[in-house]
Amino acid sequence: MSPAAARAAFRAGLRVPTSGYSAGWTQANLIALPRDYAYDFLLFAQRNPKSCPVLDVTEPGETSASIFAGDLRTDLPAYRVYRDGELVEEVGDVTGLWRDDLVSFLVGCSFTFEAALLEAGVPVRHIETGGNVPMYRTNRDCRPAGRMSGPLVVSMRPVPASMVATAVRITSRYPAVHGAPVHIGEPADLGIGDIDSPDFGEPVEIRPGEIPVFWACGVTPQAAVMQSRPPFAIGHAPGHMAITDARDSEFLVP
């Protein structure tokens, strides 16, 4: 499915996680903040490039971006709306909530490298089950910037022990979409008490012989919004991404 076709389906009301959609095309996290907070967030992202790799930034009020020819208000499957850091609703369309002062940031997403993992024979459990990737707040703090601060959020994929090195090698070639894992193995080292109870997304089975592998996650900006409490923000619903018009290969390094 092309990015344009996927966006049209979401605009028409399809609400599903986008992992596995539009293979070969880059997916992105969305965070839209008032212009007054835009510099603080841009600096936050610059200081935390592993979790917040910025792919594109709009002018205030713009509803499309150079890598996203659709409408940022309607063409993602689901959005989260925050007021003073509190999640107030999850909706499929934010047209009525959009403001002329909103600056939108498209942040790299690890869904982008999943096609490369599958091609190399590395299983991706949430794609196998048709679910959402599990995501967790961690005990690692991001570097603060201005009024923005918050914890690192990670996504987790179980990987057979014999293929962990392959997964690291493949994903390290995609630094603009989180790159190599930030942690391999014991969840408790990240402050994760129950691997079966993710903070975002859905749990997946870790089978015998598999190791949990954790990548920095673009839900980190929303965790920063919850902690920093700007007056208003809009983000994608975790796992329900912006499918861009950029190719995965554009973010692949040798």
Curated annotation (Swiss-Prot):
Please provide the record's keywords in A-Z order: Lyase
- Supply the InterPro entries for this chain: D-Glu_cyclase, Putative_hydro-lyase, UPF0317
Instruction: Extract the SUPFAM superfamilies matched here.
Output: PSTPO5379-like
Could you confirm whether the keyword Plastid appears in this record?
no
Instruction: Fetch the Pfam families from UniProt.
Output: D-Glu_cyclase
Q: Where are the transmembrane segments?
A: none
Q: E.C. number, please?
A: 4.2.1.-
Work out whether the entry's keyword set contains Transport. no
Q: Which GO terms describe its molecular function?
A: lyase activity
Q: Which EC class does it fall in?
A: lyase
The family note in this entry says: Belongs to the D-glutamate cyclase family.
Query: What is the designated name of this protein?
Result: Putative hydro-lyase SACE_1553
Species this protein is from: Saccharopolyspora erythraea (strain ATCC 11635 / DSM 40517 / JCM 4748 / NBRC 13426 / NCIMB 8594 / NRRL 2338)
- Name the lineage: Bacteria, Bacillati, Actinomycetota, Actinomycetes, Pseudonocardiales
